[in-house]
C-alpha cells in the first residue's frame, strides 16, 4: 500500500502495493558481534522483517556478514557522514543503506555511493530527522517545521537523482507527532518514493507506543506509508510487538490473534488484570487467525464479546468459557486461563 514505486531490500519488497513491513534496530554496540547476532535472532523470531544496525566505523562493518549468516531477514547499515563506510557496507553484502547524501561531502562521494548501491541493487533510505536538519533549512524556517523536513528529504533525494539513482526510501521523523504527520503528508503529495514511517525519540515503552500509534496509525489510515518502525527506549523486540499491534488495530494485518479485554467495573470479582496479562503473553506467538476475549463479568461478558471466536468471563471466584457468545462451561478462577488455552488449541 502507500507509494507507487517499489524497492526491494533483500527479500522484502517496500512500497508499490507490498504489505507493510515491520522494522527494528539493534541496540547492542556494533563491536559486540555475539550480542548483536543474539539480538538479531530474537528480533527475527518476534517477526521483525528488516533489521537495522549502526555502522559507526570500519570495525563495525564486520558485523554485517555475521548478521547475514545468522538471520534471513534483510540487514540495513545505518551510516552517517563517512561515505567510505557505505561503500564497505555494500561490499560486505548489506541489503539496504540508511544515509543522507547531503552529509557525506562532494558530488564525487555521493556518486560513489550511488554507483555502489546501483551495481548491487541496494536501496538507500534518506532518513531526515528533526534534530539534524541542515543549517540552511533551519535558518529558512526557524525550527523543524513539517515543510522543513519535507524540503530536506526532497533535497537529499535530488542529490541521488542527479546520478540517475532512484532506488530510494524516504523518512521524515520528528518527536512531535503533528509535525511528523504533516511532513509525511507533504512528501506523499510530491513524490512516489516508498515511505518509512516512525516517530523519532518517541520515549519510553508507554509513551513511545502512544506517540507511535498516533503518528504511524494516522498516516496508515490515509494510505500513507510502506514500512514502519516503532522507536522505544526499551528492548527492540517490544518495538516489533508494538508495530504488529498497530497493524492489527488498523485491520491492516489480519492474521494472528486479535485480543480484547474489558476495562473492568464494580461487577468484576476476579483478578482480571492478572488474567488478561497472562492470556496476552501466552498468545504472543500464536499465529491462529482468531479473536480472543477476556471479560470481567458474566452479566455482559459473553454478549459484549459475541464477535470473539473464544473467550472467558469472570464470576465470583470462577468464570465461564464461551465460544461465539455461547457458554460452554464454568471453571474455577485459577483454571480459567488454562481452560481458555485448551479451547484455543482445539480451534
Spans of features found by a protein language model:
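Hydrophobic or amphipathic alpha-helical targeting/insertion segments
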Residues: 84-125
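Hydrophobic faces of well-ordered beta-strands that scaffold small-molecule active sites
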Residues: 20-26, 51-53, 75-79, 97-99, ...
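Catalytic alpha/beta core domains of metabolic enzymes, predominantly
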Residues: 128-129, 137-284
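Glycine-rich, proline-tolerant flexible connector loops at the mouths of alpha/beta enzymes
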Residues: 33, 44-67, 98-106, 168-177
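Glycine-enriched alpha-helix->loop->beta-strand junction motifs that scaffold or abut catalytic
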Residues: 70-73, 91-97, 118-121, 188-194, ...
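Active-site mouth loops of central-metabolism enzymes
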Residues: 17-35, 54, 73-81, 137-150, ...
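Alpha-helix-loop-beta-strand connector modules within alpha/beta enzyme cores
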Residues: 58-79, 112-124, 184-195, 279-281
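N-terminal amphipathic alpha-helix/helix-capping segment at the start of soluble metabolic enzymes
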Residues: 1-25, 281
